[in-house]
A protein has these predicted regions:
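Well-formed, non-transmembrane alpha-helical positions, independent of function
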Residues: 17, 127-128
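Acetyl-CoA-dependent GNAT
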Residues: 3-81, 86, 101, 105, ...
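Conserved acetyl-CoA-binding loop-helix of GNAT-fold acetyltransferases
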Residues: 91-104, 130-131
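Conserved GNAT acetyl-CoA-binding A-motif
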Residues: 106-118
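Conserved acetyl-CoA-binding loop of GNAT-fold acetyltransferases
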Residues: 129-139
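Short, charged/polar, Gly/Pro-enriched secondary-structure boundary elements
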Residues: 153-160
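Conserved beta-strand-loop-alpha-helix junction that forms the acyl-donor binding cleft
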Residues: 116-126, 142-144
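Active-site acidic-Proline motif in GNAT/NAT acetyltransferases
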Residues: 86-88, 92, 120-121
């Protein structure tokens, strides 16, 4: 199944599919809707890296990173900003694919770690991120716990498909 997954740029042709993605109801307070993420990306184009996750011809998720190498807070040098997997597509490895793809992009950019922040507690994504190698740092951004995952910078990867 994972071989069918790919990341695509958000375009005029697929923006409606992006905005139609909905997480489970118990997750709605934990991650911003895709439309909000796209507004953030529009206002911060120099750092935002938004991508739709496709399985075949169907949009099944959305991932957005921030790459801000000059930011005073190193968390934002390579940061998993948003991850929205459609409710009916969760538990199928799509989130893992998105995070691993983002790690590849971060490594291609020469980064040594990927950061994420999340709401901890019931229904929160902490367990998911820990299974992917993220460890809490003890820091918080607003009311979200920060976790990091080490990555190894690699030679340039062909990211033209992303």
């Amino acid at each position: 199944m994972l071989a069918e997954l790919r990341l695509e740029l958000v375009t005029q042709q697929n923006v409606r599919a992006a905005c139609a993605l909905k997480v489970r109801p118990d997750q709605e307070g934990l991650v911003a809707p895709v439309a909000f993420s796209l507004a953030d990306a529009y206002t911060m184009p120099d750092i935002a890296w938004p991508r739709l996750i496709y399985q075949g011809d169907q949009a099944v998720g959305f991932v957005m990173a921030a790459f801000a190498p000059d930011h005073q807070n190193p968390v934002y040098h390579s940061y998993l900003w948003r991850l929205n997997i459609g409710a009916e597509h969760q538990g199928k490895g799509i989130g893992r694919f998105a995070v691993e793809s983002l790690c590849q992009e971060a490594a291609r950019r020469g980064n040594h770690r990927l950061s994420v922040s999340y709401h901890s507690g019931q229904h929160g994504p902490e367990g998911f991120y820990r299974r992917l190698g993220f460890q809490p740092t003890g820091a918080y951004i607003q009311d979200e716990e920060v976790a990091e995952r080490p990555i190894s910078p690699i030679a340039a990867v062909d990211s033209a498909r992303w």
